[in-house]
């Protein structure tokens, strides 16, 4: 269950909508009992710096590209 203490990790790229990573990673995270979620973030090349800086500010725990 997602709470105010839940952290996140993400897949970032363009495109990411086809990726099965969020399904697989979230199943593994839940199985392990970790308070993390894995999300996919669509990001255009020209927005990469802005997105990365924003993710730092909201304490993203890790990224896959």
Each predicted region: which residue ranges?
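N-terminal ligand-binding/catalytic initiation module
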Residues: 1-65
């Amino acid at each position: 269950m997602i709470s105010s203490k839940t952290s996140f990790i993400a897949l970032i790229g363009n495109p990411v909508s086809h990726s099965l990573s969020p399904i697989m990673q979230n199943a593994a995270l839940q199985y392990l009992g970790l308070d993390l979620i894995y999300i996919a973030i669509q990001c255009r090349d020209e927005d990469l710096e802005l997105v990365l800086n924003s993710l730092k500010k909201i304490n993203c725990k890790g990224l896959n590209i």
